[in-house]
């Protein structure tokens, strides 16, 4: 088991691989199924993980995008994602990581405040996507969006890079810091 690196494998021709990471197995499975239903020009591979680091496997494909799914109804979900982030190489945060937050629609049941997750995404300079994955139509729309992001991150969309896309997905209330 080791740190997950973005460039440790060569890219595959017409193949895009996403890694969905969360403690919520049922939500991950439903999201993965919705993504696989989407029409994609390249071969789409979806890997699910409920923990990091991943086992060192020679046959594991190159991962083009990592999506950390955080359930606002579970502090455990946020704590585990924070732990998992330690096992991801910093090169992934150059446009190949995003956070997907679910459960924001029912604020009265949230045990994690939205601002906590916003700060986490801002700290890692990664986009934050909000979606209630319990609702089929929302899940399908998010799956289409993630497939499109994945195609860009895999380099299958001419003229757009992952880093360029992620800078466009940044929220306007969190402008880039002046320290850079």
UniProtKB/Swiss-Prot annotation:
Cellular component, GO, one term: cytoplasm
Gene3D superfamilies per UniProt: P-loop containing nucleotide triphosphate hydrolases
Domain of life: Eukaryota
GO biological process: one example: chromosome segregation
Source organism per UniProt: Mus musculus (Mouse)
Quaternary structure and interacting proteins, as annotated: Component of the CENPA-NAC complex, at least composed of CENPA, CENPC, CENPH, CENPM, CENPN, CENPT and CENPU. The CENPA-NAC complex interacts with the CENPA-CAD complex, composed of CENPI, CENPK, CENPL, CENPO, CENPP, CENPQ, CENPR and CENPS.
Subcellular localization(s) per the UniProt record: Nucleus; Cytoplasm; Chromosome, Centromere, Kinetochore
Protein's UniProt name: Centromere protein M
Record function comment: Component of the CENPA-NAC (nucleosome-associated) complex, a complex that plays a central role in assembly of kinetochore proteins, mitotic progression and chromosome segregation. The CENPA-NAC complex recruits the CENPA-CAD (nucleosome distal) complex and may be involved in incorporation of newly synthesized CENPA into centromeres.
InterPro entries membership: Centromere_Cenp-M, P-loop_NTPase
UniProt keyword annotations, A-Z: Centromere, Chromosome, Cytoplasm, Kinetochore, Nucleus
Taxonomic lineage of the native organism: Eukaryota, Metazoa, Chordata, Craniata, Vertebrata
PANTHER family: CENTROMERE PROTEIN M
Name of a matching Pfam family: CENP-M
Major localization listed first in the record, in broad terms: nucleus
């Amino acid at each position: 088991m080791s740190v997950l690196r973005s460039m440790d494998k060569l890219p595959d021709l017409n193949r895009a691989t996403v890694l969905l990471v969360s403690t919520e197995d049922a939500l991950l499975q439903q999201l993965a199924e919705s993504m696989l239903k989407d029409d994609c020009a390249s071969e789409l591979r979806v890997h699910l993980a409920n923990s990091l680091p991943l086992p060192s496997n020679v046959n594991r494909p190159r991962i083009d995008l990592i999506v950390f799914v955080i359930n606002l109804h579970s502090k455990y979900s946020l704590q585990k994602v924070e732990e998992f982030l330690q096992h991801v190489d910093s090169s992934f945060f150059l446009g190949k990581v995003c956070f997907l937050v679910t459960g924001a629609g029912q604020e009265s049941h949230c045990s994690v405040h939205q601002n906590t997750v916003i700060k986490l995404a801002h700290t890692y300079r990664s986009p934050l996507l909000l979606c209630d994955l319990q609702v089929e139509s929302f899940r399908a729309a998010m799956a289409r969006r993630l497939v499109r992001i994945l195609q860009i991150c895999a380099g299958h969309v001419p003229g757009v890079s992952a880093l360029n896309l992620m800078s466009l997905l940044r929220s306007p209330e969190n402008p880039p810091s002046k320290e850079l």
